[in-house]
């Protein structure tokens, strides 16, 4: 993986002795905001979502990993290929194309777990996919970059941020394992922690979105990269949903895989860019990564809003057709989908894909006054 970055220019490895170029001075506050929010989100949100995971269901996912396999195919098959096609289609410069490929080769991020919760996705599958994709990134990131960057040349090999990947793994596994233990020992307290964590995670996403919009005025980014950062996560969501649908996953899993596919780990992408490019190019490339992170949050919030609106509309229509539901003071079901969806998801792992489809089709018509 070596050649020219921009005509006769080169992309030497990042040097700590170089002064930041013009335009980077104002990024300190932005980097600090995203770093702090990411740390809080990874710690608190993953612990709270771990409280929604049952060890038995998690083990079933790992024993028969149909959903995880489809998710990994989307993550390290569709996303790098999409990045390559976007780079070719938009005629990007070599260093810009490499940055887009780095983003497409990254594993899923924590944002996907928050969004999955709010679209009633399969949290066990979501957390399993995030963890497994991070582990797989140790080998798949260099493989994908080796395959797709051969169309361009760099004067120096790209550097995989193995330390950052290790830190990400620890920040995922430890809080989730703690949450699973809390759910096993104190299920009532775990439900409360889950609600608090989901609310905090949602607010953090809003803060990230607002902060990004406010600070985006000073971003120095190529218009083409800005357009790609907007459409790339959308393409990931759509392609992930279609592949999950074509492989006969349940609607719940289709939503989960769709969210997981489009939401990338921005921190790993930034870490790799800092290790692989000089400060001369980091101005545009870091802003591309931040823009992608902003758009994936904005797209995710729109998806959540659309799903919640659809859910309320369906519930309202059902209640109008069944007035007896108005007289039922129903208790709140567990936040992670309804009971019949949980049974359907378990059936998917136990019975196989075809039986699960029949189960899902039957249970999807179960009336509910919730």
From Swiss-Prot:
Glycosylated. It is a multi-pass membrane protein. It comes from Rattus norvegicus (Rat). PANTHER family: SODIUM-BILE ACID COTRANSPORTER (PTHR10361), SODIUM-DEPENDENT ORGANIC ANION TRANSPORTER (PTHR10361:SF55). InterPro entries: BilAc:Na_symport/Acr3, Bilac:Na_transpt, Na+/solute_symporter_sf. The keyword Metal-binding does not apply. The gene is Slc10a6. It is found in: Membrane. Belongs to the bile acid:sodium symporter (BASS) (TC 2.A.28) family. Glycans are attached at residues 8, 14. Residues 1-32, 89-97, 148-159, 217-224, 284 are extracellular. This is Sodium-dependent organic anion transporter. Highly expressed in heart, lung, spleen and adrenal gland. Moderately expressed in skeletal muscle, testis and small intestine. Keywords: Glycoprotein, Ion transport, Lipid transport, Membrane, Sodium, Sodium transport, Symport, Transmembrane, Transmembrane helix, Transport.
């Amino acid at each position: 993986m070596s050649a020219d970055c921009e005509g006769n220019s080169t992309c030497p490895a990042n040097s700590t002795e170089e002064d930041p170029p013009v335009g980077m001075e104002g990024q300190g506050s932005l980097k600090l905001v995203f770093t702090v929010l990411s740390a809080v989100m990874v710690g608190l949100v993953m612990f709270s979502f771990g409280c929604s995971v049952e060890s038995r269901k998690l083990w079933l996912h790992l024993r028969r990993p149909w959903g995880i396999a489809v998710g990994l195919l989307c993550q390290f098959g569709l996303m790098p290929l999409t990045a390559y096609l976007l780079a070719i289609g938009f005629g990007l410069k070599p260093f810009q194309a490499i940055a887009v490929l780095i983003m497409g080769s990254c594993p899923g991020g924590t944002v996907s777990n928050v969004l999955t919760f709010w679209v009633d996705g399969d949290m066990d599958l979501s957390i399993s996919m995030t963890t497994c994709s991070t582990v797989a990134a140790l080998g798949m990131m260099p493989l994908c970059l080796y395959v797709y960057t051969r169309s361009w040349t760099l004067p120096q090999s790209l550097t995989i941020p193995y330390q950052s990947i290790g830190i990400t793994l620890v920040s995922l596994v430890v809080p989730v394992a703690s949450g699973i233990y809390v759910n096993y020992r104190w299920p009532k307290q775990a439900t409360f922690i889950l609600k608090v964590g989901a609310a905090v995670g949602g607010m953090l996403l809003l803060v990230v979105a607002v902060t990004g919009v406010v600070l985006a005025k000073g971003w120095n980014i190529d218009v083409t990269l800005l357009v790609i950062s907007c459409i790339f996560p959308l393409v990931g969501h759509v392609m992930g949903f279609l592949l999950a649908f074509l492989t006969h996953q349940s609607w719940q899993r289709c939503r989960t895989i769709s969210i997981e596919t489009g939401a990338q780990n921005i921190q790993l992408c930034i870490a790799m860019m800092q290790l692989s490019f000089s400060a001369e190019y980091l101005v545009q490339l870091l802003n591309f990564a931040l823009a992608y992170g902003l758009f994936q949050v904005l797209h995710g919030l729109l998806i959540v809003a659309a799903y919640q609106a659809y859910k309320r509309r369906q519930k309202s229509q059902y209640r109008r057709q069944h007035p007896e539901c108005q007289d039922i003071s129903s208790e709140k079901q567990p936040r992670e989908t309804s009971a019949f969806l949980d049974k359907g998801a378990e059936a998917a792992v136990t019975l196989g894909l075809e039986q699960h489809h029949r189960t899902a089709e039957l249970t999807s018509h179960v009336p509910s006054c919730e």
